[in-house]
UniProtKB/Swiss-Prot annotation:
Gene Ontology BP annotations: fatty acid beta-oxidation; phenylacetate catabolic process
Pfam families cross-referenced by the UniProt entry: Thiolase_C, Thiolase_N
Subunit details: Heterotetramer of two alpha chains (FadB) and two beta chains (FadA).
Assigned EC number: 2.3.1.16
Gene that encodes the chain: fadA
The keyword Ribonucleoprotein appears for this protein: no
Protein name: 3-ketoacyl-CoA thiolase
Domain of life: Bacteria
InterPro entries membership: FadA (IPR012805), Thiolase (IPR002155), Thiolase-like (IPR016039), Thiolase-like_sf_Thiolase (IPR050215), Thiolase_acyl_enz_int_AS (IPR020615), Thiolase_AS (IPR020610), Thiolase_C (IPR020617), Thiolase_CS (IPR020613)
Molecular function, one GO term: acetyl-CoA C-acyltransferase activity
UniProt keywords, alphabetically: Acyltransferase, Cytoplasm, Fatty acid metabolism, Lipid degradation, Lipid metabolism, Transferase
Summary of the function given for this chain in its UniProt record: Catalyzes the final step of fatty acid oxidation in which acetyl-CoA is released and the CoA ester of a fatty acid two carbons shorter is formed.
Pathway: Lipid metabolism; fatty acid beta-oxidation
Amino acid sequence: MTNLNPRDVVIVDGVRSAMGKSKNGMFRNVRADSLSAELVRALVARNQFDVNEVEDLIWGCVNQTLEQGMNIGRNIVLLADLPKTVAGQTVNRLCGSSMQAIHTAAAQIATNQGDIFIIGGVEHMGHVGMMHGIDLNPEASKHYAKASNMMGLTAEMLGRMNGIGREEQDAFGVESHRRAWAATQEGRFKNEIVGVEGHDANGFKILCDIDEVIRPDANLEAFKALRPVFDPKGGTVTAATSSALSDGASAMLLMSAERAQALGLKPRAVIRSMAVAGCDAAIMGYGPVPATQKALKRAGLSVADIQTVELNEAFAAQGLSVLKGLGLYEKQDIVNLNGGAIALGHPLGCSGARITTTLLNVMEQQDTQIGLATMCIGLGQGIATVIERV
């Protein structure tokens, strides 16, 4: 068992919603803030602690407008019936937003600026489109290629640079769905998914506790039949090898080790290290490589020490490129064992805490000790978190 110092940052618990399709999906009548509040209530109900001690609720969200606007973090505090004395903020590091929420809370705990934090993230891509209201600076093209704003083209670039062809991408995508559906059937998501009321295709209310985006019938023949979507003439990236558009939320409970101990709560993991890094916007998907290298160095570890990995699958070409860059290409049996974003979707602000929660559950299922959660970020960034079970 890991010996903990008083100001070590521990993960007490983590939950998420099921992932809903963004187009006419099960959460089409559920707001992003309401979905998030349901998770906060569940997190509080699952763990015995005084909510008056919560310092801050930190929520990741990318497109902060419409129902996701006006500091959705504070709105979630009020909707979840937390005490009015609990603060709330919203953070944005694009795809890495809710992992940044982890890092922000962890930094505050480590520096004695609070003992208990609720963090998480949400994105309702069906209600608030990824590019809704976006007005990019025309002068930006003087500083980086305009195509860098098109995530699919950055994936095409990585695929070409790393020799990852269409066949390999298709196989990776099919495997993501296979793993996710197997995890669903075997109940491996039960500890992390909180059922939230939504609607079925006929408009009847249902409890949504199974990921709607997974395709149980995913197969190579169907994937091969699809045309490239971003580079029609010579491309390799298709809709099936890209992360699905989905709606979802995630939440985690972080504490100082000393406060968790005083409350009699058993931590599930301790955060060993954290890092962010920048890279060329044209290959934004490569960001997890420098971010992970930084995080490992800070933890005094090497890639060989990592036993379980959750890598956000923005695209198959991107995920495979990162695995090559990190020396994990031949170790895909420790990466995304319950499937990844190609099967589950990538609700932007939700994904960081989602993959960290999934990582924690997979580590418990596999009885591994040290794990890595990492993801790429649009316009050329990466973020990484190393955790250790306690």
